[in-house]
Amino acid sequence: MATRIRLQRHGRKSYAFYSIVIADSRAPRDGKFIEKIGTYNPNTNPATVDLNFDAALAWVLKGAQPSDTVRNILSREGVYMKKHLLGGVAKGAFGEAEAEAKFEAWKNNKQSGLAALKAKQDEEKKAEAKARLEAEKKINEVKAKALAEKKAAEAAEKAAAEAPAEEATEAPAEEAAATEAAAE
């Protein structure tokens, strides 16, 4: 039986996540499978992979053929590196302890690279948020200044409108007083 390691789609439209399964190559994409060995969520940044490493390695050693995406996932997780090192042990190039040490060194190097990438992304997010906040502060200052100018103009206009009105009310009173004085 030709076995494949491939992805089985789950999730909703435009938000897919996948199960990594061992299936007969003739089975439909989301159909019957032999074993589920992990999950893959490409929606996160970086993509989240939860993999049963030992089961994946066992199936690769048995000769199961991965799909292109699964091959990239297995390579990134170190399954193919482990297979390569086990091949060296089988040929007698080095011992199993040395192979394990090389694998751990490779894994630590890979994880430190991922941690650096994550830290860089966090810094970029913080810088972007800070820049957005500064831009918003500038916009708010401009709006506040324009509003203050508008209120000052309205107050001046209101004061100017009240001054002639007061003069107008005082002027008829003075005229009335003048006419009363003239009448006496």
From Swiss-Prot:
Xref: InterPro entries: Ribosomal_bS16, Ribosomal_bS16_dom_sf
The organism's place on the tree of life at top rank: Bacteria
GO function term, MF aspect, one: structural constituent of ribosome
Biased composition (Acidic residues): 164-173
Ranges of Basic and acidic residues composition bias in the record: 150-160
Biased composition (Low complexity): 174-184
UniProtKB keywords: Ribonucleoprotein, Ribosomal protein
Annotated region described as Disordered, given as residue ranges: 150-184
Gene Ontology cellular component terms for the protein in this record: cytoplasm; small ribosomal subunit
GO BP, sorted A to Z: translation
Family that this chain belongs to: Belongs to the bacterial ribosomal protein bS16 family.
UniProt xrefs under PANTHER family: 30S RIBOSOMAL PROTEIN S16 (PTHR12919), SMALL RIBOSOMAL SUBUNIT PROTEIN BS16M (PTHR12919:SF20)
Protein name: Small ribosomal subunit protein bS16
Natural source organism: Bacteroides thetaiotaomicron (strain ATCC 29148 / DSM 2079 / JCM 5827 / CCUG 10774 / NCTC 10582 / VPI-5482 / E50)
Taxon lineage: Bacteria, Pseudomonadati, Bacteroidota, Bacteroidia, Bacteroidales
